Amino acid sequence: MKKGDIYYADLSPVVGSEQGGNRPVLIVQNDVGNRYSPTVIVAAITSQMGKASLPTHIRISMQESGLPKSSVALLEQIRTIDKSRLKQYVGRVSKSEMAMVDKAIQVSFGIRI
């Protein structure tokens, strides 16, 4: 598992407006953590394209990602999950999409570089 990979994950149970259920997630944790930690940091992905209106929303192309339809990574919906929640590998985002994801994480966390 590497940063930029997409998996289906079981995100239930949830509270309030959290994204839940069996859904695609984007691995955003660094590869050292991915190798040694029992947990992984992910961002929820939705296929509701109308959601791509915030600076923390990044469009993901279905052609490159392996997703069944074009989708949106929700970088305000980042959470740490146990690796056992990851189910099926889907694919990867492109390098240019991952660069946009990294910028959206900076926006989400208020990091200025």
Each language-model region and where it sits:
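Conserved functional hotspots at enzyme active or ligand-binding sites that engage polyanionic ligands
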Residues: 1-113
